[in-house]
Amino acid sequence: TMWGTKWCGSGNKAINYTDLGYFSNLDSCCRTHDHCDNIAAGETKYGLTNEGKYTMMNCKCEATFQQCLRDVHGPLEGKAAFTIRKLYFGLYGNGCFNVQCPS
């Protein structure tokens, strides 16, 4: 995980759901994202197979995560959120999926 957080990065170091790191606003964004609907690499769900190397997230969760990161401010925490946003959405770019009910 990233310094100052318990939820940002691969896995988490939190002892429970309410356990947040020093950058609590940023950590809250990551915690919510970690609990989003997803399809793990190599898994199939909703008739979709994730053939990528990384977990594929629900598109609504990705949009919410991106906005949450944008809403984090402060000289250190804001820069950390900006860095995560640029790395995650700029380099990671695994795509996302939408679930729609049949009409």
Swiss-Prot record:
Q: What does this protein do?
A: Phospholipase toxin, which catalyzes the calcium-dependent hydrolysis of the 2-acyl groups in 3-sn-phosphoglycerides. Inhibits both skeletal (RYR1) and cardiac (RYR2) ryanodine receptors (calcium release channels). Probably blocks ryanodine receptors by generating a lipid product.
**Name of the molecule in the record:** Phospholipase A2 large subunit
Record GO terms (molecular function)? calcium channel regulator activity; metal ion binding; phospholipase A2 activity; toxin activity
Q: What detail does the entry give on cofactor binding?
A: Binds 1 Ca(2+) ion.
Subcellular location per the Swiss-Prot or TrEMBL entry: Secreted
Task: Enumerate the residues binding Ca(2+).
Answer: W7, G9, G11, D34
Pfam families xref list: Phospholip_A2_2
Which Enzyme Commission number(s) are on file for it? 3.1.1.4
Let me know which tissues express this protein, per UniProt: Expressed by the venom gland.
In its keyword annotation, does this UniProt entry include Ligase? no
